[in-house]
């Protein structure tokens, strides 16, 4: 925190909002996403590994598909074709068991709320059922007006745009905002937006994959963050 304060020439760190990524931060959904990505892309002769799914997590799905097609099939596809391919991935994902909320998420949100801070969610997903689930699961803490989806921005993560849009929705400046992420692209987006960025390493990637993108702190899981929350907003 002291390093962040000095790097951004701040007198003190007084956060007013927390912006959460969704998959891999609020929900233990990344294993399902990895399987859905692999199975769906096989249908289009695209080879995608579980590690690829984790490494590209946070980006708009259509952007990931465009890059994979370009790299493996050496052709450019438009948004419409990428969306059709992404719809197959979405369909497979929704046939899988419902991902559980990570232990500690609601406890953390309660602590944030008690601090008088706002909460938003910034996701690369554009799936309406997932947005509805967010409201259902976390309605005590967030509103739909404070959720940023793939459809709210032209440039997805790792561009800062999704988190800048999130700040606009919660009404804070970058130096007043904490971003909680689990993916390298998401961390890069949070850092690029100027936020204090906490990485929760809930996946198989090494911590270095997150620190290399500029994460200010890396924590092993969201429960650990909940338990140590008051050390961050001291």
Task: For the regions a language model picked out, list residue spans one by one.
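Short, acidic loop-to-helix structural element flanking the phosphoryl-transfer center
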Residues: 6-9, 14, 94-121
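Short, surface-exposed acidic
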Residues: 46-55, 73-85, 140-144
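Asp-based, Mg2+/Mn2+-dependent phosphohydrolase catalytic module
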Residues: 1-16, 80, 110, 126-234
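Anion (oxyanion) recognition and catalysis
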Residues: 42, 113, 191
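A metal-dependent, Asp-based hydrolase signature
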Residues: 58-93, 103, 111
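Structured helix-beta-strand junction loops
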Residues: 59, 115-116, 213
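A general structural signal for well-ordered alpha-helical segments in protein cores
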Residues: 34, 61-66, 86, 105, ...
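Active-site neighborhood of HAD-like aspartate-dependent phosphohydrolases
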Residues: 2-52
